[in-house]
């Protein structure tokens, strides 16, 4: 009992340290479906500018109806892992559909996108191999690389010259197989990876190219296939990226679940060796059925994608017009740079009072001195929503001294 109390005291100290340093995270509870507008528990309706609901599909009537149909036809859950009795026809259909959508041969589903990255490397790469990773890659990628025995190399963020050097080093040190892994879109900056240049470097050094497309699938590229389409690496429907990981928890409906798509042999080896696939319950039928409906919508029309990008262009221009510094780009992730952590939190808090829901990010989520409010634009936002949001930003910016007093 004394040991238990000592441990709990230790945990308490860590929690208090998080609070003292302004790093303690609280959950703001909403009482409505996810959408352009949400209601908080105090009854306020606010414009939601912090969801990954890029295409507005989280509560789309056709997606919800598909989930309900799948619930009725295939049940609530499977109570099994895939290789025992947890594979339904819906699962195989979704795997085939997402692979085809991305231009790859096959795909494997996971209960979470974190798993798709977390278990990719260990089954595929051994002690004689190497993995080369962007320094700003997502935590799931970092954790996955730590689990494997391959040699690890890191290149400076989005630095192609450094990537070239690390690939040369990996080859010079005798790596058998080399995999380069990057986020397609980096979630804190909205930076889009230069996959075309990376493909050329990988070809020069005989390396595989793998990409996490969680913040791209469904809306990046002319038909929403992702960053590889955006960068010209989708030829006649065939991907020139070797392996793609992604999620159904963002643009593709916003529920949960992840996937890895790639060559048929790679996917088959993952089915045999990836531990979450072998030891975790299968993805629920309602999510699978709804995700198939999402792909139906995206293959029928680019209207949602087009609306998202129109909203993004307008919002970026309007925010720059009132005087805010935003990270350049064309992605619906719009970092509004504040630099000071306290000011970022104050700005987010004041915006909530003004009816706009955003979140301030600061160290250790972003580097010290790089605090920002991250805005995520959606196809579900009306033009009026965005006009109101920019006006609220301008008012809060003036009040906090982030903008000149006469900023409009």
Would you name each region that the model predicts?
Residues 306-355, 365, 369-370, 377-379, ...:
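Conserved PLP-binding catalytic core of the aspartate aminotransferase-like
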Residues 65, 69-113:
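Conserved N-terminal alpha-helix of the aminotransferase class I/II PLP-enzyme fold
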Residues 53, 153, 157-211:
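Active-site phosphate-binding strand-loop segment of PLP-dependent enzymes
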Residues 120-139:
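Conserved PLP-anchoring active-site segment centered on the Schiff-base-forming lysine
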Residues 223, 229, 236-269:
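Active-site PLP attachment segment
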Residues 7, 11-76, 207:
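N-terminal "arm"/small-domain region of PLP-dependent enzymes with the aminotransferase-like
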Residues 252-319, 324-327:
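PLP-dependent aminotransferase class I/II
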Residues 61, 65-69, 73, 96, ...:
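PLP-dependent enzyme catalytic core of the Aspartate aminotransferase-like
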């Amino acid at each position: 009992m004394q040991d238990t109390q000592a441990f709990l005291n230790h945990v308490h100290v860590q929690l208090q340290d998080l609070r003292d340093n302004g790093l303690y995270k609280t959950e703001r509870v909403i009482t409505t479906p996810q959408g352009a507008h949400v209601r908080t528990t105090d009854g306020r309706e606010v414009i939601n500018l912090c969801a990954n609901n890029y295409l507005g599909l989280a509560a789309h009537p056709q997606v919800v109806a598909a989930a309900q149909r799948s619930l009725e036809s295939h049940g609530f859950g499977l109570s099994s892992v895939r290789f025992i009795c947890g594979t339904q026809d819906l699962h195989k259909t979704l795997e085939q559909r997402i692979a085809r959508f991305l231009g790859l041969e096959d795909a494997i589903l996971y209960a979470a996108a974190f798993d798709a990255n977390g278990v990719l490397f260990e089954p595929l790469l051994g002690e004689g191999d190497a993995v080369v990773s962007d320094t700003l890659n997502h935590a799931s990628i970092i954790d996955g690389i730590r689990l494997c025995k391959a040699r690890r190399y890191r290149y400076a963020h989005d630095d192609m010259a450094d990537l070239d050097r690390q690939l040369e080093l990996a080859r010079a040190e005798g790596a058998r197989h080399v995999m380069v892994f990057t986020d397609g879109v980096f979630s804190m900056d909205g930076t889009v990876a230069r996959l075309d240049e990376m493909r050329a470097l990988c070809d020069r050094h005989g390396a595989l190219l793998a990409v996490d497309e969680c913040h791209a699938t469904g809306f990046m590229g002319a038909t929403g296939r992702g960053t590889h389409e955006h960068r010209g690496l989708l030829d006649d429907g065939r991907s020139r990226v070797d392996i793609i990981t992604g999620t159904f928890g963002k643009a593709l409906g916003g529920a949960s679940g992840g996937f890895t798509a790639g060559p048929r042999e790679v996917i088959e080896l993952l089915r045999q060796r990836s531990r979450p696939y072998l030891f975790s319950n299968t993805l629920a039928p309602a999510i699978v059925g709804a995700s198939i409906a999402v792909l139906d919508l995206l293959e029928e029309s680019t209207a949602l994608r087009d609306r998202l990008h129109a909203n993004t262009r307008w919002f970026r221009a309007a925010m720059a017009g009132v005087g805010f510094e935003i990270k350049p780009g064309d992605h619906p992730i719009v970092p509004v740079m504040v630099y000071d952590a306290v000011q970022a939190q104050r700005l987010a808090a004041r915006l909530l009072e003004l009816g706009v829901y955003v979140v301030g990010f600061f160290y250790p989520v972003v580097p010290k001195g790089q605090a920002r409010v991250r805005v995520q634009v959606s196809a579900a936002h009306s033009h009026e929503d965005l006009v109101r949001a920019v006006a609220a930003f301008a008012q809060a910016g003036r009040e906090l001294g982030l903008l000149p007093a006469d900023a409009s």
